[in-house]
Amino acid sequence: MTTPLIEIRQIYKSYGNTPILNNVSLNVNHGEFLTLLGPSGCGKTTLLRLISGFEQPTQGEIFINGQCVNQLPPQKRDVHTVFQSYALFPHLSVFENVAFALRCKKTPNQEIRKRVFDALKLVQLESLAERNVKQLSGGQQQRVAIARAIINRPQVLLLDEPLSSLDYRLRKAMQSELKQLQKTLNMTFIFVTHDQEEALSMSDRIVVFNHGHIEQIGTPKAVYETPANLHVAMFIGEANIFDIQVHTVKDQDIITNIEGIQLSCKNTGNYQVNDRLHLIVRPEDIRVWSLSEVEKTEGMLPGRIVDIIYKGSTVDLKVELSSGKIINASEFFDEDDDKLEYTLHETVWVQWLPGWEVLLPYEG
């Protein structure tokens, strides 16, 4: 069995009487892109600072390559951090910002030049080496910060919400570049974000945080399609949630009632009659049918379209059910498909196939 590069063992962190992290344990593998995902104030950045050595745990241990590093200062941990603010030296050129750590070590000039240009080439900035960093765009400044962080080839690169200040288009481009850089370097990246799309598109695994606890650890597919609890389901993407009760268990299915309609669902949790559950279905898994398209309405819910949002590749619909509950549906847009020409206030039928839903124990 491969030894993890980083082991977080029962970490607690408090500031005064305020708990920030509560019994957090986590292993990080060699060459892994791991994302710490959660809302503001959940403890994810605090954990990053504990790994880097800028903070000390109140209780628990942190191991890097099998060595406990609790007492080691940041410069002894072979871990580098890219901060949200980039923390560049505004009076220095791109080259000198990247070379700074090497100059502190009194590295020979010839070696500095080679290593700096190697790092700048990886982030596609070699042509801007002599430019002052104040003359760069936000995306270019971020690349400089990354080049400076990888110049010594640390075992772990920690990234604290580095994309949050970029505009949407640049943020999307940088997501792809960061992932490709991580693969090229075969370096362990630990990435902090509150953005679910970033986490899903970049990560090998995602660690979902909430109120100082880890709620779930898994691949992007696992945390999206099989969330561990209601918080994960609601935080990762959009979710329509129905509170239901099991009426009948039949083979591998359960029968329940939603909006007065009897529906069949896959019994994925060995649930029993009278169990209260949350039924979760993603907007992209809901199908919306006009009245003229439907002959048999068994297993469908009647509704009325109350909003239509055109997004280019998709059409998002808000459908009001008979109880007044609003659910979201998302359809891929095809301009040649007349079936996607919905009208406001149109009466429709909505459905999803058994097994497309997620069932979770009721949380009250």
Curated annotation (Swiss-Prot):
Q: Which UniProt keywords apply?
A: ATP-binding, Cell inner membrane, Cell membrane, Membrane, Nucleotide-binding, Translocase, Transport
Signal peptide: which range, if any? none
Disulfide bonding pattern of the chain: none
Catalyses: ATP + H2O + polyamine-[polyamine-binding protein]Side 1 = ADP + phosphate + polyamineSide 2 + [polyamine-binding protein]Side 1
**Membrane topology summary:** Peripheral membrane protein
Cite the GO molecular-function annotations of the record: ABC-type polyamine transporter activity; ATP binding; ATP hydrolysis activity
The ABC transporter domain extends over 6-236
Binding residues annotated for ATP, in chain numbering: G38, P39, S40, G41, C42, G43, K44, T45
Q: SUPFAM superfamilies recorded for this chain?
A: MOP-like, P-loop containing nucleoside triphosphate hydrolases
* Gene Ontology cellular component annotations, sorted alphabetically: ATP-binding cassette (ABC) transporter complex
Key word Transport present: yes
Question: Which SMART domains does the UniProt entry name for this protein?
Answer: AAA
- Chief subcellular location equals membrane
Q: Which Gene3D superfamilies match?
A: 2.40.50.100, P-loop containing nucleotide triphosphate hydrolases (3.40.50.300)
The record, for PROSITE patterns, names: ABC_TRANSPORTER_1 (PS00211), ABC_TRANSPORTER_2 (PS50893), POTA (PS51305)
Q: Which domain of life is it from?
A: Bacteria
**Location within or outside the cell:** Cell inner membrane
Q: Which EC class is this protein assigned? A: translocase
Q: What EC number(s) does its UniProt record assign?
A: 7.6.2.11
Q: What does this protein do?
A: Part of the ABC transporter complex PotABCD involved in spermidine/putrescine import. Responsible for energy coupling to the transport system.
Query: Which family does the similarity line name?
Result: Belongs to the ABC transporter superfamily. Spermidine/putrescine importer (TC 3.A.1.11.1) family.
| Complex formation | The complex is composed of two ATP-binding proteins (PotA), two transmembrane proteins (PotB and PotC) and a solute-binding protein (PotD).
Protein name (database record): Spermidine/putrescine import ATP-binding protein PotA
This protein's encoding gene: potA
